[in-house]
Amino acid sequence: MIEEASKQKGAVTGIASGFIDLDYKTAGFQPSDLILVAARPSMGKTAFVLSMAKNMAVNAKIPVALFSLEMSNVQLVNRMIVNVCEIPGEKIKSGQLAPYEWGQLDYKIKELYDAPMYVDDTPSLSVFELRTKARRLVREHGVKIIIIDYLQLMNASGMSFGSRQEEVSTISRSLKGL
């Protein structure tokens, strides 16, 4: 394994996130990786993971599953449209677009539609439910990356814990087993 990596000379050996510095430091996401993106509220975690999902599914055509425990499919798709179009969000939301921007918007929406991205916005998803859905997506669509937005809203149904921290820890361990 180390010998194989040395032949790659710093190349991405896993799945590229589309963020050059991150890919350089991690060599891409490897099949056994569980990566947690954590930060204080309103720091851009959702925007970051949506950008990675877009880079993987739209640009690299890698099948991605995105489980959002906080936002609806519509909210996520709207954010992704703004992300891929490179048109200010206010203009898209208001519909005040120049003719060339309508064309750009149409093209980018088609790109998103054609991308191998599978979004699930089931609220209060349990670890068991997520694992079941994720395994089905892997089996039926060849999903290679699973992104969970807002892990703290997930529950470990049927189990009791002394603290929420213990529950999140158990959820994380269970997800690693995916």
Give the predicted meaning of each segment.
Residues 24, 55-142, 156:
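Cytosolic-facing regulatory segments adjacent to core modules
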Residues 41:
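The conserved Walker
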